[in-house]
């Protein structure tokens, strides 16, 4: 996609805000989507992060942006009304209880963070490969076959559109740390947010 420029830096909502914990609705009106995409990229770059979903900026729509550099390759784009497929034979992402009771994994657990649970990272098992099918900001369909960290990013952002944060998927042994983080930061209630700073030139 072309170089991203412009856009407003928006508040990023923190766990407890209702839109983060409810399934997002499909995008049906593409007339103002270009501005939304610019604002989402500006906010993600300022954070900084590698992905940002609509619910994180208080927008309950099925849209996310991503930007991740792997070696000399830049993976960057917007996914609107996405579907995520884990290939047959690849273990599916596990639920909270399944991860607590199942020692088998689909890859080594890398640590994840989230702009809606800022300042913390926890290990989480993810499928090592996925296929993302979605529409871009011009309503053009596309498909991406992703592995490794790009696959992890897609799963993380897709979860946001389902009303799920990555901390909801952690193994049971981390639940105490998650609860304590929420208490310490007075999260878990509607309206909590933070605003990324404008990147310095």
From Swiss-Prot:
SUPFAM superfamilies from the xrefs?
Peptide deformylase
**Which Pfam family would be a valid example here?**
Pep_deformylase
Give the InterPro entries listed for this entry.
Peptide_deformylase, Peptide_deformylase_sf
Indicate which residues the UniProt annotation says bind Fe cation. Answer: 114, 156, 160
Q: Fetch the Gene3D superfamilies from UniProt.
A: Peptide deformylase
Which transformation does this protein catalyse, written as a reaction? N-terminal N-formyl-L-methionyl-[peptide] + H2O = N-terminal L-methionyl-[peptide] + formate
- Any idea which residues are catalytic in this one? 157
Q: Which cofactor does it need?
A: Fe(2+)
UniProt cofactor note = Binds 1 Fe(2+) ion.
Q: Name one GO biological process term.
A: co-translational protein modification
Q: Provide this UniProt record's keywords sorted from A to Z.
A: Hydrolase, Iron, Metal-binding, Protein biosynthesis
Q: What is its EC number?
A: 3.5.1.88
**GO molecular function list:** metal ion binding; peptide deformylase activity
Per its UniProt entry, which superkingdom is the organism in? Answer: Bacteria
User: According to its UniProt entry, what is the function of this protein?
Assistant: Removes the formyl group from the N-terminal Met of newly synthesized proteins. Requires at least a dipeptide for an efficient rate of reaction. N-terminal L-methionine is a prerequisite for activity but the enzyme has broad specificity at other positions.
Q: Which family does it belong to?
A: Belongs to the polypeptide deformylase family.
In Swiss-Prot or TrEMBL terms, this protein is called Peptide deformylase
């Amino acid at each position: 996609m072309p170089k991203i420029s412009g856009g407003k830096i928006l508040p990023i909502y923190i766990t407890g805000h209702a839109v983060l914990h409810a399934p997002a609705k499909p995008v049906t009106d593409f007339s103002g989507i270009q501005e939304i995409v610019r604002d989402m990229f500006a906010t993600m770059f300022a954070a900084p992060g590698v992905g940002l979903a609509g619910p994180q900026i208080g927008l309950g729509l099925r849209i996310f942006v991503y930007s991740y550099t792997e070696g000399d390759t830049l993976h960057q784009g917007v996914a609107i009304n996405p579907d995520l497929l884990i290939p047959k034979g690849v273990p599916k992402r596990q639920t909270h209880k399944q991860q607590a009771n199942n020692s088998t994994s689909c890859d080594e657990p890398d640590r994840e963070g989230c702009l809606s649970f800022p300042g913390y990272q926890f290990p989480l098992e993810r499928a090592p490969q996925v296929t993302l099918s979605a529409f871009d900001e011009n309503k053009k369909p596309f498909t991406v076959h992703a592995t490794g960290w790009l696959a992890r990013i897609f799963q993380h952002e897709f979860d946001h559109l389902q009303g799920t944060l990555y901390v909801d998927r952690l193994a049971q042994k981390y639940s105490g740390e998650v609860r304590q983080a929420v208490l310490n930061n007075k999260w878990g209630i509607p309206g909590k947010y933070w605003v990324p700073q404008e990147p310095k030139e």
